Amino acid sequence: MQWTKSEQLYKEALQHIVGGVNSPSRSYKAVGGGAPVVMERAQGAYFWDVDGNKYIDYLAAYGPIIAGHAHPHIAEAIRRAAETGVLYGTPTPHEITFAKMLKEAIPSLEKVRFVNSGTEAVMTTIRVARAYTGRSKIVKFEGCYHGHSDLVLVAAGSGPSTLGTPDSAGVPPSIAQEVITVPYNDVESFREAMNVWGEQVAAVLVEPIVGNFGIVLPKPGFLEAINEIAHKEGALVIYDEVITAFRFMYGGAQNLLGVEPDLTAMGKIIGGGLPIGAYGGRQDIMEQVAPLGPAYQAGTMAGNPASVLAGIACLEVLKQEGVYEHLDRLGAMLEEGILAHARQCGLPVTVNRLKGALTVFFTDEKVENYKQAQRSDGELFAKFFKLMLKQGINLAPSKYEAWFITLAHTEDDIAYTIDAVGKAFRQL
């Protein structure tokens, strides 16, 4: 493949856009650098770049394009919004319809509020939890990404009883001191942290199924223990379901796992590709939010007709019979094919998969936490990424990210991808 136009456009972008990209995850820095491919069109499971190259897409915009690019039902909803007005600044009937759909799908959402992104949703759930409890500290888990607000860009201290340190320039140490970070899937470290800080903890923030250092499932009893220990200390539990909501079933990962949080943050996937976020939970906690309570949250774009109509259409698609069975069937086919080629080539490969989402780790060990994910071979992944790109397979440019299958992918797409994996593995 030739990427002449992509390279030219990247040089131009560097003159006008910081780093040439509008999100660091779009950079190829983690896979050896170079110009990222500039995409021009997307349809179904496919991308076409500015040089005319076609790709099977497993990025799916980091998850939300679960129905496939330009799905006709979602596209029609967006057209309807364009014709009737995309932003009102007033209540609309559509936001009520959408709120009811979310509540019916995820029973723990007794009340909801729309925002514009997953970052906003997480940020606000923390504020609401602080307002409800009168406390300031939060506990989160190592390697889990919860957006780019100051309070969640905090790295772990030297141990479970140690406060965090800033994980980004511009985050004051005073904010990092409000965060305790512990390893995912480690109940005893969490218990130790709560024994030390529990009386000051407003909330425990957790991905019920990790999506941000790869697809990682909770160990049996882990989420139940978080609820028990947190509630014993008077802290709330917040689930970040920005990636997991509606990805594995019609509802949240909490439905699938049978464990309910006090508050839930959502984003990405519920908008069908348009910017949106939402948060919700127990009514008595949500009544802390203005105009009913003292916790302020507002947004001109929140609940805008375009995003809400696209979200309604997306959930209508996902509610159809056989949707998640299709994703699971193709996911299993892809996983089996990848592992078969890895065995044939003698490569250290572990695949973590749940239904239509998976992560390929270049390691022999089972990946259940962030440190194990870190030990996955990044140099090997970088070579693999570029070999796959040359064969027309678009993956996220990071060893930590998931491959996302959409409703638009077919068995032929998966078969082609498995063949490409085999060719790539033989060159590693």
Swiss-Prot record:
- Where, subcellularly, is it found? Cytoplasm
- Gene Ontology MF annotations: glutamate-1-semialdehyde 2,1-aminomutase activity; pyridoxal phosphate binding; transaminase activity
Q: What class of enzyme is it?
A: isomerase
Q: Which residues carry this modification: N6-(pyridoxal phosphate)lysine?
A: K268
- Report the catalytic activity: (S)-4-amino-5-oxopentanoate = 5-aminolevulinate
- Give one GO biological process term: protoporphyrinogen IX biosynthetic process
- Which pathway does the UniProt entry assign to this protein? Porphyrin-containing compound metabolism; protoporphyrin-IX biosynthesis; 5-aminolevulinate from L-glutamyl-tRNA(Glu): step 2/2
What top-level branch of life does the organism fall under? Bacteria
Required co-factor(s) are: pyridoxal 5'-phosphate
Q: What is its EC number?
A: 5.4.3.8
Question: Where is it predominantly found?
Answer: cytoplasm
UniProt cross-references to InterPro entries, sorted A to Z = 4pyrrol_synth_GluAld_NH2Trfase, Aminotrans_3, Aminotrans_3_PPA_site, PyrdxlP-dep_Trfase, PyrdxlP-dep_Trfase_major, PyrdxlP-dep_Trfase_small
Q: Name one GO cellular component term.
A: cytoplasm
Q: Which UniProt keywords apply?
A: Cytoplasm, Isomerase, Porphyrin biosynthesis, Pyridoxal phosphate
Give the CDD domains listed for this entry. Answer: OAT_like
The family this protein is said to belong to: Belongs to the class-III pyridoxal-phosphate-dependent aminotransferase family. HemL subfamily.
Q: Which PANTHER family match?
A: GLUTAMATE-1-SEMIALDEHYDE 2,1-AMINOMUTASE (PTHR43713), GLUTAMATE-1-SEMIALDEHYDE 2,1-AMINOMUTASE 2 (PTHR43713:SF1)
How does this polypeptide assemble, per the annotation? Answer: Homodimer.
The name this protein goes by in its record: Glutamate-1-semialdehyde 2,1-aminomutase 1
Instruction: Report the source organism.
Output: Geobacillus kaustophilus (strain HTA426)
The taxonomy runs: Bacteria, Bacillati, Bacillota, Bacilli, Bacillales
* This protein's encoding gene: hemL1
